Amino acid sequence: MSRAPRTDASPEGPNPSTSPSAPPLDSAFTWHSESAEPAPARLSPVNDRLSADTALKRVRRGEFLLYSGDFHNAKQLLGALSRRLPQPAKARSPLEAFRAERRARQLEHETLSRIVVSLDRDYRLGLARAPDTSLACHQVWGDSTTDTTVVPLKQLLGMLGAAEWRRKGLAVPGLTGLLHPHYGVYLPTRTDYVELLNSFTEVKGKRVFDIGTGTGVLSFILLQRGAASVQATDCDSRAVACSRENAERLGLGKRFQVAEADLFPKGTADLVVCNPPWIPEPPKNRVDRAVFDEDSQFLRRFLEGLSASLAPGGVGLLLLSDLAVLLGLRPPGWLEAEFERCGLSVQWARSTPARHSKAKDASDPLHMARSRERTTLYCLKPVSP
């Protein structure tokens, strides 16, 4: 919770005392930011009269612009600001392209996150033509403890989109029934790793650990194919809640247990499955942790602890994209060297080309690497003494 010292009027905005979406002067408000950015010390009310050029100048000066007016105009302002940001220069290598693209996305995030809106105690948005935001916010934050919540508009739009996915569900190849993902949990829209897991046939009756379960999709596929039980872990409380809810929806709750934990549960399993983050770079926010693994720390620790978590005769299944190698973030042969360091042998490996939309998009800055990306399923066993 943060205290707003002052709300400044501006030439482009209404008087804050009459704005339907501006917090009252000197009122306490709850601030939500996925990137853990500190609460604004000051909010500058603006409305539909604000031009994108003026907004960009003010944001670059460090202002947080509290929008009141029309919801669709506010969304158009975000789009106009995004179009005014510099695009990455043409890179000479995949690594250069990756670095430039990430800097551009960070600049976009920092810029657009300065356009903020306020919600009342029931998380209602006071903009004209605004959708119902109450359910989406309650799903993510729970009940409000203050009369006013302030949030970046871009984040709120992401929450609304996630609430719709959660409502209607997502069909995943190989899964009987729909998956209902939660906000902030990685959306399993890629089918390559699911198809690879389905190629593993020795499932029936196995006790399984699922490390970094996310939505729980890999666990549910294995349970529907005859696994005896799954103990899943994830370091994010949202993923824990999401996977638990989906297990109940799919009628798998009695055979699925999940805990908020770092890596392995206690005991051993016949089968240990992991689809870790595949980019060895620092995450910029909470959602990034599903993709970015700084210095491969998660992957290294998984490989180091795998043998101790396997029952006699058990195997580990590692699903991993080679995009980091193609981008120059890992040298060729790095993973194989890690297997050897951790006393693991590869029983077999199966690969498939990436089939996500970006792999086919020639306009994507990382197309050179993504068009050659492959995902591999490694079957690992401890090296015999």
Enumerate the predicted regions with their spans.
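N-terminal auxiliary segments of SAM/dcSAM-dependent transferases
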Residues: 3-8, 13-36, 40-170
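Conserved SAM/SAH cofactor-binding pocket of Class I
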Residues: 190-276, 280-284
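Conserved beta-strand signature within the Rossmann-like core of class I S-adenosyl-L-methionine
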Residues: 313-320
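Short, electropositive alpha-helical surface patch
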Residues: 324-342
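Class I S-adenosyl-L-methionine
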Residues: 336-383
